[in-house]
Amino acid sequence: MSTSIDWSDEAFFESPERESVDGGITNFGPLWHAVSPRWGHSMNAMCSYYGMFPAKLAHYFIQSFTEPGDLVLDPFSGRGTAPLQARVEGRKSISNDLNPLAYVLTRAKTNPPSWMAINEFVSEIERRYHSEAQSEPDVPSDIRMLFHPNTLRQIAFIRSGLLQQEIICWSPEELMLAGALAGILHGAHRRDGSSGYLSISMPNTFSMSPTYVRKYILENNLKAPDQNVFERLRDKLARLYMDSIEGPVGETFKKDASHLMTSQAIKPGTVNLVITSPPYLRVVNYGTANWIRLWWLGIEEVGRQRGAGRKSLDAALDHQHSYDSYRTFFAKTLGGMRRVIRKDGVAVLVVGDVANPGEEPLPLARQIWDDVGEKSGLRLINFIEDQLPTQNKVSRIWGETKGRATERDCVLILARDDGEPAPAAEVVEWEEPYKDRGPDAAHARLRDLRNAL
């Protein structure tokens, strides 16, 4: 067993994850913490993504600073929380992320196919699977150890069909299938041994290294379930489609964020609200944390230090910043925001404090603003400190072994130095008009679908 992480004590492999890691307070009161951790559109549950902010935070600022029809931008969209929330609240959205997983999740949420279309698509793939002779899939041993052979054959068949073309060319149905299956690809089993996931029992939020997982499987005699992937996928889709989704279809890019904001893709002075969380400083490698899901999307060897996929993603995502390089990155990001924000617009940046082993936490948001804010063309109009107990943060599992997030996130609220944003809404409404009769309706839709097959 590893000396730095006691998985058995944390019970990550033996029991399901908690529904939420929320429970904080801000220096201005509860704000978005005042509502249930379950608040938000059902599509938000498509796939976990380390470092994400909750839908209710996005809603709080969308309601505070925009009106229906306004344009919302998230240049580091992660799992697509902000653009999804913008759409269901009647706002237009532009989103962007270089991480292939983030790009797929965001596009799937901002332009999903209809319930019938996605299920017809899944059924057609299932028919092809059963009509063709299936050979043993050619997959890395790091992947093979996670799944029952029958489960893996289904996964590999679906994957081979998706990878006939580049991710950016995928249809709404392909994106939804890819995102939904990514969400059930690996996760913890229930106490009775059953599972809605496809893998051995393991964390859902992130992936430990292949070497560690292999050792843990052997030491704990873990067994992978023999799953009907198509049925588990339909179960997942039924949960995702619990709520209605209407509003303007979002536009999603897979580019360097600062380049996007200085390109002709976004006209100057057109964005009402930027809401985003830039990559945290040295806290997580967004490639290796998702190496299993990235394999599913066609990127090999991300889990290995010298793997080809690891090298290409590290180069593209550029997440191994020193503070000096992070400062340069942040300055470019602010410069791009200054260009696209309207004079009455606002930028909301969620930035986490970080700490190195044996050192005092670095108040990253305050320090980075002090260092680069004056020359950014933006001004600070508010600074919110969001306290979250360290034991509720996923980053606690790395212990004292590397730079990590602390219990505090900070929210920088910025405006153009020559602008005057409208006052924030005094009251934020928490009604969810997109709720479509809840889980009972989802079960009924799934039952009707199965009866029709």
Language model feature labels by segment:
Residues 1-67:
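S-adenosyl-L-methionine
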Residues 263-264, 269-273, 279-346:
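SAM-dependent methyltransferase catalytic-core segment centered on the flexible catalytic loop
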Residues 174, 312-382:
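Conserved Class I SAM-dependent methyltransferase catalytic core
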Residues 155-160, 164-276, 281-284:
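SAM-dependent nucleic-acid methyltransferase catalytic core
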Residues 369, 377-438:
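Class I S-adenosyl-L-methionine
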Residues 58, 70-89, 93-100, 106, ...:
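Conserved proline-anchored active-site loop of SAM-dependent methyltransferases
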Residues 101-165, 299-316:
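Conserved phosphoryl-transfer catalytic core
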Residues 54-57, 154, 158, 326-333, ...:
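Alpha-helical packing segments of well-folded alpha/beta enzyme cores
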